[in-house]
């Protein structure tokens, strides 16, 4: 099934963009993290703290495999770390058209300021951690991207229009 798959760093706008694309395209919206947290009845942070990152990543892979079987086309927002897991490469490529929301370091720092949602930002200096993770993840996101757009530089409506135009052109080919 050719779902519209949204990937990107924490704070890149995956959920907001996904919801708007879903509305505009008339497709259901799925947030992979929300599926996991609902099934576990815990926040992502609580799952990380109680069971560890490997357990959370295994849950992501399980849900990803299930989404591939879904015959109804959807807009799907993935967790920021999912594309980094080697075992997910095959599934991610099968899932559909991948849209990478690329945020600048400044944009992401600003959006993540004060956020305690993501346990990946715990520990060392937050700005350094964001910079380090972004440097590690950006090449992986780019590898999977069928479409790439930059967030935080244009008004939201223009960003959505750009994605929809690129999506339409990509899917015609």
Language model features: what each stretch is:
Residues 15:
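Walker A/P-loop
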Residues 23-34:
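Post-Walker A helix-loop "phosphate-sensing" segment adjacent to the P-loop in P-loop NTPases
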Residues 6:
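Hydrophobic anchor at the beta1->P-loop junction of P-loop NTPases
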Residues 95-138:
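A glycine- and Lys/Arg-enriched "phosphate-lid" helix/loop adjacent to the NTP-binding pocket
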Residues 9:
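P-loop (Walker A) phosphate-binding loop of NTP-binding proteins
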Residues 34-91, 118-119:
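ATP-dependent small-molecule kinase phosphotransfer cores
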């Amino acid at each position: 099934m050719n779902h519209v798959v949204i990937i990107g760093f924490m704070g890149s706008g995956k959920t907001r963009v996904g919801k708007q694309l879903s509305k505009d395209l008339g497709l259901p919206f799925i947030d992979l993290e929300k599926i996991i947290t609902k099934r576990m009845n815990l926040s992502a942070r609580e799952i990380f703290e109680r069971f560890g990152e490997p357990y959370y990543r295994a849950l992501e892979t399980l849900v990803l495999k299930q989404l591939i079987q879904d015959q109804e086309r959807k807009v799907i927002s993935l967790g920021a770390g999912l594309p980094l897991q080697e075992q997910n490469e095959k599934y991610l490529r099968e899932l559909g058209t991948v849209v990478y929301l690329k945020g600048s370091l400044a944009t992401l720092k600003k959006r993540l300021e004060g956020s305690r949602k993501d346990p990946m930002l715990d520990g060392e200096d937050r700005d350094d951690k964001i910079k380090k993770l972004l440097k590690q993840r950006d090449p992986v996101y780019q590898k999977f991207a069928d479409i790439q757009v930059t967030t935080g530089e244009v008004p939201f409506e223009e960003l959505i229009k750009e994605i929809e135009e690129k999506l339409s052109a990509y899917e015609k080919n």
